[in-house]
Each structure stands twice: as C-alpha cells, then as structure tokens.
C-alpha cells in the first residue's frame, strides 16, 4: 500500500514538472504575427527512427519480422499468434509524432481495405447465379460488357499511315495464301483440335452483316454455338422439360457449313449437358432440384430453368477445362511430356513483392484484331478441303468457285443459310437420319468422330490455304480494312514483340518475302491481315511449341486464353461446388493422375458410353492422330495403359431377373463363364509376369477350382466359427468405444465409415497378415481408412467397373494400390516361407488380436501347397482379400439400413431381445434376421458370358442368347422373386437358407459365405444390444443412394461428389452406455 502511494506521488510530480516545462516554453514564444486572426501557426512535428527505438522492444522487432515475412511470402497468417493485435500494440506504443507509426497505421488500413473486394464481383440471387443467354451481366457493374450485340473493341492504335490504295485482296490470296502443295501438320495434330478451335472462334466472333462493327455473339467462352446467342436462339434448342436440350441439336446454323466433325463435337456437348441434368436431378443435392408437379406451371418452369442453367454452367466448365487442359497443352507440346503443368488462368494470386496480382472476373470484350488472328484455314486437311469443295458444289451447283465473285459467294451462302429450317431438329446434318426420339444413331456419330481423330490437319504458314477459300480470305482482308486495323508490326509491338525489320523477318521463304515486298514496299506497311497468317511458322519445341503456328499468333492466342478465362466470373469467383453442386464440380475437374490432367475423355465417354473402352486412345488423346500418339506414349513408357482399337458398339448385357433363371445360369459352368479374369490379371500383373489367372474367380478351368479348394481349406480350420464370432464381437465393440461420441448427451457414431467398414479391414488384415497400423500394431503401414479404400478400389475395379467415364481412373488407381499392398504382403509371406518362425513374425508385428495366429497359420498352410510365395500372394491372397472387405461391409450396412427404415424398424425390439439373450438359438435367429435384411437391401448383379448359343427362360419368356453375349443375373430382383421368397417384402425367419442369392450361387458362390454369415450376424448382435437404436436425425442418418439399371443401388461418397458401389456414411444413435470391452482384447 505504501509503495502504491509513493508511486502516485512520483507520477504526480512528473506531470507537474512537465506542465511547468510547457508553461516556460509557451512564455518564450514570439508574438503571433504570422496570421491575421492573432493565432499561432500550428507546426507539424514528426519524429523518426531514433525516437521510435526508445519505445520498441524485442517483441516488437519479432512482430515486424513476421509482418514482413507474411507480406513477402503471401502465406496465411496464424491469427493464434495474435499478429494483428501485436501490430496494434506496436503502432499504439510509438510516439504520437512518429512518422513510422503513421506509415504502419496506413499499411494496416491498406491491408484491412484490401481484405475485401471493392466493389464485390460475386453476388447472391438467381439473377447472378447463371449465365444470361446473351452473355450480359458477367460484370455486374458493366452488365453490357461483352454481351452479344456489342461493338468489337480495338486493341491496337493504328498510328501508321498507310496508302489508301492497298493491294487487291484476291491478288494477295493468289500471291501469298493459295495452297500449292499440301503439308501435314509437323506434330501430327488431328483435325479434332481445329474443330474445337472452330467452336471457340465462333463462340467469340460472329460479325453482324448489317453492322460489321458489332459481334452477334458474346465475348465469353459460353458455348453459344450450342446454346445460342440470345434468348430466342436458346429457346429453340431447349425442350423446357427437366432442364434438357433437344437431342443432338445445336443453335448455330453456320456450323452446318463446316466439316461434320465440328457439329459432332457440339452434339457431344449437347449429350453431356443432358447427362449432367439427369444426374443433378437424381442426386438433388440439399433439395436444390426437387421436382414439382408439372401441373404447377410456374414452379415447374423454375425447376426446369434451374436444372438447365446449372447444366449449362457445368457443361461450359468442362468446355473450359478441355480448352485449358487438352487444347492448350497440345498447343504448347506439353502432351509430349509427363509434366502435369498447365497454363491455368484461374490460379489464385495475391499481391506480392513482385507486383500486383492479375485481376479476376472483370468481364471481357473481344477485339477486332483477334477476329483476324483466328483465321486458320491453312490447317484444313486434305479430307476437309475435299469436303468443302463438295459442299460448295451442293449449295451452288454448276458454279465454278474460281470464277465466282465475292458478291455472288456471299449471296449464295446467304440463300443456303436462309433455306435451313428454323427448328433445330429439322436441320440436315451430314446426311444422317434421326431416330424416333430425335437423336442420331450413335454408330454414325462415332464413325465421324473416329475419322476426325485419324485425320491429320494441315500445317500453318503461307501458301497453304485451299483455293476454295479464296472468297472467304478476300472478304477477311476487306473486313480488316473496313475496321481500320493497325499493321502487323503495330500488333506485334502491342505484345512487346520486336517489329519485323525486313520482309525476310516476316517469312524467310524468298518467294513470300519478295511477294510481300512487291505488295507492300516496307515491312511496317504489311497489314495485320494477311500478315499474321503469312508470317513464318514456329518450329516444334518440346515442350513449348506444339501448334507450330505463325510467330505473332502463337503469342496472341495465349494472352487471349488468359483474358477469356480469368476475366469470366463463371470460370473464376463463381466456379465453385456451391454453384455447380459437389458432384458436378468433381465430374469435370481434371485429375493429374489421368492423362496428366487432360479431360477430353470425360466428354467422349459420356457422349458415347457404348462404343469406347475406358482406356481408348481415341477418347483420351483425340487432338493428335493415333499413330503419333503411339510414338508419344511409348516414349513416355505408358502406351500399354491404353487401348488402340478402333471404337465399335459394345452390346448391353441382357438382364435376367427371375430367381430360377439366375440360379440356373450361375450353376451352369459349362455354358456360362465368369468374366473377371482379365481384370484380376491386370491388377495382379507384376514385373511382366502374369498372376491371377488361376485364382478361383478368374475362370472356369480346373486350376480355378483348385484355387477355391485350397483357399477354402486354409480359411476354414478347426474351431474357426468360435474364433470368428469372438473376433467380430470384440472388434465391433472396440470400434464403437473408439469412434462413438456424445452430441448434447446423445450417443452417436458413423456406423458405416467407422464401424462396418473398419471391422472388415481388421478381419482381413488379421487373416491375411496385411500391414494394418493400429494401436496393437503401431509398425503397420496403412491406417484403417487407407486399407479400406485400397480394398474397395480393388473390389470395384474387378466386380463393379460399370461407369465407363470413371473406368480408366479406377483401374489405374486400383492397380497402383494393389501393387503397393502386394509388395508389403510379400515381405510377410517370404519371412514365413524362408524361416518358418511364425512366433517371431507374430511378435515382430506386435499383433495381439484374437485372429493373429489364425492368419499366420493360414499362410503357412497355403505355403504347404508347394506354390511359390509370389503365386500365393499375387494369385490367391490379394484377390481373396480384395473380394472380402468392401463386399462384407456393404452387406452389413445394407442390412442395418433396412432395420433402421420405416418398414424394418418394427423388428428392432425383437432383435434387441435376442441379442441380449445370448443363446445359440437366439444367435441362429439373428443370423436369419441378417440374411433377410441383406436380401431386402441387396444390390448385387453377377455377369456371365455365354460360351455357346443357348436359350434361357426368364419369367416365362424365352431369351435366345448368342455365344459371346453377356448376361447379368440381377440378384436384386431374384431376391424379391415371390416364387422363391413368398411375401418377398416381409421379413420371414423360416425361409430356406439355400435359396438366398445375394452371396451368389453355384461353383463360384462366395467362398466366405459361412465366415460372412457368422461375422456379420455377430455384428448385428452387438448393435442389436443397444437400446433404442435409431438413425441420427436428418440426412446424416440416411444412406445416400440412387437406383441404377435393374434397380441396383449406387451410393454416393461422403461429400456426394461421386458414386460408389458401397455405402459410405450413415450415423446412428442409441440410449445407454456401451458394454465393457474384454481387458485382454
């Protein structure tokens, strides 16, 4: 208390002295004669670093260091270090006169200002969420920027004084452009790349013939050739039903005057759009696309429009990704490397020490200069040159193109276009006939696409435009003149490229250089068009130069690509899962593990799902001809990953639905063969040695039967049932204890992800000595969830590879993880094979679970067969393990889902009673409850291929099956067949156990059937003991699933960004505490 008083006295004394000093200073001031009102002029006093240092300590220095580091690196700030508060402390602690304090405060204010966009570029509301038909509203503050009907921008100031008497356009064509000798593209780029370029060009440029300063299309990559330039055109291609486009249609008429490969690409985008809206409606993320009754006209119109507009965003998103990941990669020759680098303008950037980040979502307006940059007629192939000549003769019969005036040419094209029907479904396309549903025959479209992929395009450069394009090129030259565009050199200087000083700089070909000299007198006077297309073309460079276009064009198109994508709100700030939905966003995203991030295959395989193998070279790399792709991919060591077969129709399997027919087929091993051998061998191939051919499910030969017998003997040893029951009871309980939690006092767990899936992982890793990392085995390699994903990938690749669009990605990923797991499993098996020291191995692995010795002894029994360790692992252990985990987890989750459903929950009280009774009789009934629940939620279909012609009777209908035809035994319908299961929708505990079909039937019936029944009914018993077992409220308590062909369910992963054959997540709740674990488990 005394010290406080002394401190207050001293402080007061200091204040008094300070006040006296101020009074003395004031008394010494001169009179205020500098102002008219008799006041003193206030003098600004600023202090510098010297005075600041007396107010700064080590903590402040550290604060400044961290601020400087953050500004330099752009790394996120760790706000738990209180950096902002420490900056405030530093600024507040400096003298009020400190110059540095003022600068620090300014920097702080600048940072806070820059945290937010001024003005914002992304907004809520339906009006802002979707593209407008005419492209308006991309920039909310300049809504007409880039809209259809806007005037072209001018990029370059035309300062050079040119003579009004410029060379005749047709003379220019004959001197500089006319094709004399056809040259293939030096990098063997296919015509498909230039068909895509045609779509891009006509997406951005469509000069209004009534006012050639105006473009009738938007300045955005919004697929307007498909969707239309305005609302009227868009309405013509819409069905106004379920968000769909009219089948195999596109809005623009102009494309009908191009080689049919261009139209095929647009039809492919049309099909992709319709595929997307089907999926969006089926998934209905967060109820976003809940379908109203069609009688409610206004609500249904909103539903249809929401689906259509979202589908357009998604389809345009794939279009942009194809441009950036396939088209630009090929242009830059990166496709010839294994690099995943790409020029993606959507990259997020922040201001840094090297300058400000490029702006984003600003909008765009195309310029007249770029209109002439994209005239690539030199690259038209010989095949398309002939097509164009034939087309010309068709629309202007009897007219010689070489003598046709430009006026007559324009008039002839106008008459042709005016004669096309307004209704897109009625417009002719390449002589193809529409089917009753309005679509074209897939065979015809695929044939056109195949021929386009195989057609090598022409090379860029002078003297390479087909003669048939003389009028087109002459009109282009005249149009550039009417726009008063700058010269070639002015355009180059705009990009900071050195101007051409001589005609030989423009083109080293003496003839072209001389012709330019005679036409223009001086390099500075060469017009931008035809200048940009008669320039010398770049050489090929890997990577760097793949398109091998003219020098100036090669620079301009990259700048344009960045501006078009980075300036588009819908490809940047509004390109999010929230706008597109999680599934759609993921569907169009590149995966660097597939084709180094290229995505063209996503379009091809969705448009034509019944013609291509999932690894078809025609689908994955269509922008280069197949023969050249073979050289490229061989040099990269990946050619064997792809199929080089030409596309051909793949027949659909015939679904068999009756129980009797399914059982008959599955039992008839002579006529109907299993189909999984090729997939198993693909996954198990090791060091160019084929493994897996003799695995039990790989075929129907004697070695396959021997595999089944050997694995059965190894799995089912003495007292296996008691050991399996004990394992599943304790493992399930342990996982419940480990992964359950309380929410507001209520018990909850993700029963699928954290219990059902993981229990099978533990069982499989114990039985087969797989390297699982757990508390009891900390030296394992794979975490529980990792090993589950590996096993699920293996199972899906072998048995559920049904989605052609994901097939390649799935198979490559499954093979990679299979190889990793196999190598680690080999290490364990080889130790046993070489030493036989089982006990030492058990100790080394730190295993303490109830099945650890079971698994080690099982491997020893397999080795006793005399087979090499490699054969044991790659042909028998890995395929068996891969067939167990995900399948068993699926069965249990489906069974539990039924008993938690409205129709099945009435059985829970009896299951609860039986589970607590804990008698053999009660356990038998629980097994029957499990089999019934699994039957009622079955999602299994088993394929077989007919080895010879036969007839199958299915539900009273005789089906003729040809040799080589695949039949699909639909066990979903077989499990609900009333002839085998009377009252099929009810749970009945007295059914014949031999009739259950969901484990298969016949010689390839699930080998682990008895293990599975025992283990999974034990899990049901553990869960059944919990009181008031129920779903968690809301969507988290449901299995997210959709019905596929034949009623076979497909599930969605946790974030609903993709489909999977297996349940992924479902949360349950219960009352009371969990039973105690055994101490020694």
Curated annotation (Swiss-Prot):
Optimum pH is 7-7.5. Keywords: Dioxygenase, Heme, Iron, Isomerase, Metal-binding, Multifunctional enzyme, Oxidoreductase, Peroxidase. The keyword NADP does not apply. Belongs to the peroxidase family. GO terms for biological process: fatty acid metabolic process; response to oxidative stress. The gene is ppoA. Homotetramer. Changing residue 374 to F: Impairs the linoleate 8R-lipoxygenase activity. The keyword Metal-binding applies. Its cofactor is heme b. SUPFAM superfamilies: Cytochrome P450, Heme-dependent peroxidases. The active site is at 374. Its EC number is 1.13.11.60, 5.4.4.5. GO terms for molecular function: heme binding; iron ion binding; isomerase activity; linoleate 8R-lipoxygenase activity; monooxygenase activity; oxidoreductase activity, acting on paired donors, with incorporation or reduction of molecular oxygen; peroxidase activity. InterPro entries: Cyt_P450 (IPR001128), Cyt_P450_CS (IPR017972), Cyt_P450_sf (IPR036396), Haem_peroxidase_animal (IPR019791), Haem_peroxidase_sf (IPR010255), Haem_peroxidase_sf_animal (IPR037120), Oxylipin_biosynth_metab (IPR050783), Ppo-like_N (IPR034812). This is Psi-producing oxygenase A. PROSITE patterns: CYTOCHROME_P450 (PS00086), PEROXIDASE_3 (PS50292). Residues 105-446 are annotated as: Linoleate 8R-lipoxygenase. Heme b binds at residues 202, 377. It comes from Emericella nidulans (Aspergillus nidulans).
